[in-house]
Amino acid sequence: MAGLRPRGYRSPAWDFSDNTIDLLLEFGFVYDSSCMGNDVHPYYLRQGDQASPTEPYVFGRPVDLVEVPVTWGLDDFPPFEYIWGQNSGLTSPSDIEEIWRGDFDYAWRHADGGVYALTMHPQVIGRGHRMLMLERLLDHIAGHDGVAFETIGAYVDRWKAANPLERWKAEHPEYAEPGPRGAA
């Protein structure tokens, strides 16, 4: 519609299949924002991870697809939407503002170069009392030196330029080395 190919992907409900990474790579995607492997620092996704209830977790190999991590704690849906039998959806916006503000303040103090990625749905955050909370939060964030509001794509371009895959793998073996993790 805009004449541009999509560069990034966020999975509905943050679900991945065994084919998701293959498809994103095949269609030239640069980043994903559906996984929770870190709180605020991006990383390269791995292809071929294997999980078993009886064996150690096995890491696959890192691929040239940047993950901009998400978290349920920075998603508007769980606290604000009613799902019968699961949650009331009636959390006060001021309670969520306190949580989101606290997460931002911690990241700003302790996670240099990180990204604070809120997940918001227009039908959820777009109600008057919630929009007022969001305005206060954005004003708070904007009041901090060194904060930039930008698209995930622009952030990923800068991050990739500073963290080429091969160098990143060498500097982050805890994410990058294929093979078993943990005890059986």
What are these regions (language model features)?
Residues M1, L23-V30, R136-H140, H144:
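Alpha-helical structural signal in soluble globular domains
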Residues L4, R10-A111, W168, A184:
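Active-site-adjacent pocket scaffolds in enzyme catalytic domains
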Residues L90-A184:
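C-terminal domain-boundary segment and adjacent tail
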